[in-house]
C-alpha cells in the first residue's frame, strides 16, 4: 500500500464514523450549541454534510465556492453525507499521485474536527471514535496550520486536558475549548 492508500483508508473510516454519528442526530439536537460557537448543531450538520462533495470537487481540480451558504439538508443528513463521502472516495480513486492539491489527510483533519464538534454537541463520547482519524488529521494540521494562516476559521490553539483523547487534542489545536471527558 502507498502512503496515499493508507491516508485514503483512514479517511474512509473517518467518513464512515461521521455518517454513523450524523445518523444519530435527532431533531431535538439541532438547536444545541457546538464547540464552533458561531454554529448551532443544525448549521454544523449542514456544513459537515456539504464538505465531502466539495472536497471531491477539489480532488478533481474543480473550482469550489466555500463562501456560499450551505443548503439545509433536513432529515436526510446521513444519506446526503454518505452520497458525498462516496463521491469523495471515488474521486480519490480517479486521480493520479500528485494530481490533487493535497492528500486525503487534509480531509481527515477537517472531518475529525467536525466529528469532534458534533460528538460534543450531541453528547457522544469521543473516546469511542477511531483515534487514527484524529491522530493523522492532527499531524497534518500541525504541519500545515500555522498561526499566520489560521484565518477566521480556526481560533488560536487552546490547551488540551492532560488525559485528552485524539479528538480532544485535534479540537484544541483547531482552537476549540475542550473540557476533560467524564
Residue ranges and their predicted role:
Residues 48:
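Glycine-rich loop at the start of a catalytic domain that most often binds anionic cofactors/ligands
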Residues 2-6, 10, 14-17, 24-37, ...:
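Structured surface interface patches that mediate subunit assembly and partner/cofactor docking
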Residues 44:
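Extended, alpha-helix-rich binding/interface surfaces that flank or overlap catalytic cores
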